[in-house]
Regions:
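Short, intrinsically disordered, charge-biased short linear motifs at domain edges
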Residues: 1
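Charged, often glycine-enriched C-terminal and inter-domain segments
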Residues: 4, 8-12, 18-172
């Protein structure tokens, strides 16, 4: 102890010199912080002893997974469904990003599963110097039901194609 006995301890601290108080703190979470990382709130912790400076609060971060994006360090990945026509004819698609919407040019004849890299569209580095990349993987979504007219049109179209239209089928 301190070598002193408190004869009339106060009702708040009972002679300990400190009072336990629950307190809500506001903090700016650093951009780019990842799961299981943390940051310090200096001077926001418990009161110091004998009038010394207050301690620090260490904040441990848990990042909630996104339903749209996958994250690997500072890179963001998204799988985006495109139509057969967009795949064959090419198109500009609008894809969600962490900053809102972004346009991606899908060239004519793009194969299903092709991934496009968008530089600097990922998560900001914690040190604030640059950002990761965003990767957009295009997957062709095949319609589950076709009308009779759609079926006939597709068969007619298929009849116009030759083996030369298919690179991967050559040799089988």
């Amino acid at each position: 102890g301190k070598g002193k006995l408190v004869k009339d301890p106060c009702k708040s601290c009972h002679g300990s010199g400190t009072i336990a108080v629950k307190k809500t703190l506001e903090a700016n979470v650093p951009a780019g912080i990842d799961d299981d990382q943390g940051f310090r709130l200096s001077g926001m912790g418990n009161a110091g002893t004998n009038g010394g400076p207050a301690g620090d609060v260490i904040v441990a971060v848990t990042v909630r997974p996104s339903e749209v994006f996958q994250r690997d360090e500072n890179n963001i990945y998204v799988v985006f469904p495109i139509t057969y026509s967009q795949d064959v004819l090419g198109d500009t698609i609008t894809v969600p990003s962490i900053d809102g919407k972004v346009e991606v040019n899908v060239p004519e004849g793009t194969q299903s599963g092709t991934t496009f890299r968008l530089r600097g569209k990922g998560v900001q580095y914690v040190n604030g110097r640059g950002r990761g990349d965003m990767y957009v993987k295009c997957e062709v979504e095949i319609p589950k039901k076709l009308s009779r007219a759609q079926r006939e049109a597709l068969k007619k179209f298929e009849g116009t194609l030759k083996e030369d239209n298919y690179e991967k089928r050559k040799g089988f």
